[in-house]
A protein has these predicted regions:
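Alpha-helical subdomain
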Residues: 1-157
Length: 157
């Protein structure tokens, strides 16, 4: 929908092969299939491409171990234009000593019980961006999406 709000923008979605047809169907139903393309692949191993102004990692880093996320962020930096933006959207795990957060705590428990995934703190994700050479790292939370957090930075290259 960001592309609809900003004419001239185009989007390419990289998703697992088993999700692509469903993704395309949703794009058709939303009337955005003319500006959103889909490509089947694995974010950890497949080519990410080049010359992107923005890379948005939406609800993906919780599936990976910290070392995998560091590798993904390094690869993403190589796919960005100079001063391109990386943005991570995730459910946030409340940090030590933080007030209880029903959304973050529930997701953290769910992932621990059902998979090898886990929810990370915003500080962990921001630390990965800094460790992989991104600059101007910022963390934003919205009351419109309880438990959600956006961590963004810019490529220094």
């Amino acid at each position: 929908m960001i592309c609809r709000l900003h004419p001239g923008l185009r989007s390419e979605v990289l998703d697992l092969p088993q999700a692509i047809e469903h993704d395309r169907k949703l794009a058709r139903e939303a009337g955005i299939d003319d500006i959103v393309t889909h490509r089947a692949g694995d974010a950890l191993t497949d080519e990410l491409g080049t010359d992107y102004d923005v890379i948005f990692l939406g609800n993906i880093v919780h599936h990976f171990a910290p070392e995998q996320n560091l590798a993904l962020l390094r690869r993403a930096k190589n796919a960005l234009t100079p001063r391109g933006t990386i943005a991570i959207w995730e459910v946030e795990q409340p940090g030590p000593g933080a007030e209880a957060d029903i959304v973050g705590d529930a997701f953290a428990l769910y992932f621990r019980l059902t998979s090898t995934s886990r929810v990370y703190t915003a500080e962990e994700s921001a630390g990965w961006l800094s460790a992989t050479g991104y600059e101007d790292v910022q963390v934003s939370r919205s009351s419109m999406s309880p438990g959600g957090v956006l961590i963004a930075g810019r490529s220094a290259k």
